[in-house]
């Protein structure tokens, strides 16, 4: 879990998941023999949480381009190299392999450190985590087991990766306008007990800082970021099925 090495903690309070400030640990100890013998579903979940970083890295670059959000190539490289290492071992993740289990653990710890260095969660999560958290809250409020975190973000990574690449491949020009999202409709999809928290974390909204003119001007570069950072659908599915 990348959260082990970061200085924030995703905590569920009253069935609502949000990030809280925490202290970064001085030492993290993991026994690869124990990790290798863990249930297959848990190891797959760790792998799913790592491939999700593709989305976070792409969105971080886009945020830097569109709203001048802080971006550090060296920090991004920590996550990118961690992804490369575990995807090279994809076909061994579910085996009783200390090397593969250790690689997943190390990769998650490194991305946690990347979050600390960046001062934000961009190096480790993106829209796939947001949707996963929504699903988790939705299920918790209905007394349903929400599934493992990495399993949810892994599935959402496939869906969002496909959506991003489809847009980048098919849409060559855009004519943006100011955001006119029907936020009342958005809020209606959340349980009443979560509304205050949802409004709090969405004020200001995610699009308030995005200039339509800047989006239009940067569209070519955005497409390039998506197509160069995100894997093809075939590659991603191959990794997930390995």
Give the location of each predicted region.
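Active-site segments that bind and position negatively charged phosphate/pyrophosphate groups
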Residues: 77-238
């Amino acid at each position: 879990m990348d959260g082990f090495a970061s200085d924030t903690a995703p905590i569920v309070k009253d069935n609502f998941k949000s990030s809280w400030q925490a202290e970064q640990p001085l030492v993290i100890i993991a026994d690869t023999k124990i990790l290798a013998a863990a249930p297959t579903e848990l190891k797959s979940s760790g792998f799913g949480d790592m491939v999700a970083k593709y989305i976070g890295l792409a969105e971080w670059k886009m945020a830097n381009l569109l709203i001048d959000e802080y971006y550090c190539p060296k920090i991004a490289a920590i996550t990118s190299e961690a992804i490369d290492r575990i995807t090279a071992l994809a076909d061994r993740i579910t085996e009783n392999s200390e090397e593969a289990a250790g690689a997943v653990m190390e990769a998650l710890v490194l991305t946690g450190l990347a979050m600390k260095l960046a001062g934000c969660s961009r190096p480790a999560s993106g829209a796939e985590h947001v949707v996963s958290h929504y699903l988790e809250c939705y299920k918790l409020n209905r007394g349903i087991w929400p599934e493992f975190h990495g399993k949810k973000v892994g599935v959402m990574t496939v869906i969002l990766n496909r959506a991003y690449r489809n847009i980048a491949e098919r849409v060559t020009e855009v004519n943006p306008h100011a955001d006119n999202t029907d936020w009342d409709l958005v809020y209606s999809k959340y349980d009443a007990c979560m509304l205050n928290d949802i409004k709090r974390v969405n004020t200001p909204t995610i699009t308030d800082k995005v200039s339509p003119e800047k989006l239009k001007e940067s569209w070519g570069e955005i497409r390039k970021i998506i197509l160069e950072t995100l894997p093809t659908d075939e590659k991603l599915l191959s990794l997930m099925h390995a």
